[in-house]
């Protein structure tokens, strides 16, 4: 989803379901990577982005790759997980 905020800020989020883990590509270093996910709208300026799973009382951050002027989102992690991944980004249009 997305939410426009005062001052031209935009907050966007998406959830990659746990069922998507089976589509992850194994990298040479043994990590797993999922791509093919997209923001609702591209950021003109990207201030911060964060990806995490929330499972009980445990939060775990993941490496994430996004660029301004693109809607593409790629997430990398070090073990095949069966948890939903939540991604949040903030920036300007």
Q: Where are each of the predicted segments found?
A:
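Extracellular attachment/recognition segments
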Residues: 7-93
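Short acidic-hydrophobic surface loop/beta-edge motif
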Residues: 1-6
């Amino acid at each position: 989803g997305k939410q426009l905020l005062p001052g031209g800020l935009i907050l966007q989020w998406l959830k990659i379901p746990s069922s998507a883990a089976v589509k992850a590509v194994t990298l040479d270093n043994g990590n797993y990577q999922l791509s093919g996910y997209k923001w609702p709208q591209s950021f003109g300026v990207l201030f911060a982005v964060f990806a995490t799973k929330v499972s009980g009382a445990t939060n775990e951050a993941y490496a994430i790759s996004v660029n301004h002027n693109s809607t593409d989102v790629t997430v990398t992690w070090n073990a095949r997980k069966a948890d939903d991944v939540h991604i949040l980004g903030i920036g300007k249009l």
